[in-house]
Amino acid sequence: MIIVKSPREIELMKKAGEVVAKVFDECSKLMKPGVSTYEINAKAEEVITSCGCTGPCKGYYDYPAMTCVSVNDTLIHGIPSHKIVLREGDLVSLDVVANYHGYCADATRTFKIGITGERANRILEVCQKAFWNGVSLIKPGIHLGDVQEAIQKTVESNGYNVAREFTGHGIGKGMHEDPSIPNYGKAGNGPILTKGMALAIEPMILEGRKDVRILGDGWTVKSRDGKLTCHYENTVVVIDDGYEVITLTEEEKKLYV
């Protein structure tokens, strides 16, 4: 069942979204060669807790951290580690969920480490474009499949693949709520959007084959062929005449709002 949020609930989610954005601002300063993914998560946890939030990822099915930090061929759910140290040219995704007074916001950014090559630059550009091409359609009365198809077409027309096993999702009191939102679909299908729905839209794309593998830790998801991956996500609320993205940094708002 899709839970429609009240104005008060959305305000609390926006507070959580502001904290997620602050995490990106602070952690962006650490995105450079020689920094471990453990250090990035430690800074994120410091920001989340200092802002009066909790990080619901930590302890979720025994997951050990508040964030996922995934590098290059790791698509999602990279466990922060002292052993994973950033290098020049890497792509690093930081997936953050903050819970403020019982309500969540969820977003992911992929960062370029130092000078990156054309492959990294292009997959990041396409991943972001896929998100915005899909989200730009959101308004009351459309089908969720309209958004999914736009994301899929953007990704595949540029020569990439969308991950099939993992999806976006509804969000609110729960970190994961209905509906499930695959990054593929057909326009005119799926739930009809209404004002007050809150959705985590998150293209997860692969440079090579769509196949993935999960490591023995039970979490880390990698491209099976070892090629680059990219992940971009925001929490989006359906409003009267369209949508509002509630997890943007102030700099991002200048670009997208």
Placement of each model-derived feature along the sequence:
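Active-site neighborhoods and metal-handling regions in enzymes and metal-associated proteins
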Residues: 1-257
